[in-house]
C-alpha cells in the first residue's frame, strides 16, 4: 500500500530537474524537483497576480507593469535591486540580467520618427514615454515632444 501511494503520487505530481520558464513575466530559475499546481488559471490568484506555468510548476506571480525594458548598458553587477516590477516605485520596471536587476523607466513599443533640424526654444514637454498619452512616445533631445511612433 505504501509503495502504491509513493508511485501513484509521483505519477500524479511528476518530477523535473530545474525547469526554466519561457513565458514573459514568469520568474526564471530552477524549480523544485516535485511538480505541483498551486493555481490552474488567473482566477485562482490574488488581484495583481496571474497563474504562471513554468513547465513543471504552476504558481501565482505578480503581473508585469505595462511598457518595455529600455536597452541597458550596465556597469559592473552589484546584485539585484529588484526581483519583479512590483518591487519598483510608480511605473518603473525591473529590468536587467538575473543577478543585476534594477528599476528603470519603461519604454513604449515603436521608435521615434526621424526629425528635420528644428530651430527655436528648447522646450521639454516630456521626460519619458509614459509622460505621453496613449501610444505616443517622448522623442527628441531639444525640444522633447510626444509624437506618434513608427513601427518597423
From Swiss-Prot:
* Disulfide bond entries: 26-52, 35-56, 39-51, 45-60, 69-95, 77-100, 82-94, 88-103, 112-139, 122-142, 126-138, 132-146
- Which cell locations does it reside in? Secreted
The chain positions of domain WAP read: 19-61, 62-107, 108-150
Record PROSITE patterns: WAP
Pfam families documented for this protein:
WAP (PF00095)
Record-level Gene Ontology MF annotations:
serine-type endopeptidase inhibitor activity
What does the tissue specificity note say? Answer: Component of the acid-soluble and acid-insoluble organic matrix of prismatic shell layers (at protein level).
Q: Which residues form a coiled coil?
A: none
Q: Which SMART domains match?
A: WAP
Q: Which keywords annotate this record? A: Disulfide bond, Repeat, Secreted, Signal
Report the leader peptide range: 1-18
General function of this protein: Inhibits growth of calcium carbonate crystals. May inhibit growth of certain crystallographic planes in the mineral phase of nacre in the shell.
- PANTHER family from the entry? PERLWAPIN ISOFORM X1, WHEY ACDIC PROTEIN WAP
Q: What name does this protein carry?
A: Perlwapin
Q: What is the lineage of its organism?
A: Eukaryota, Metazoa, Spiralia, Lophotrochozoa, Mollusca
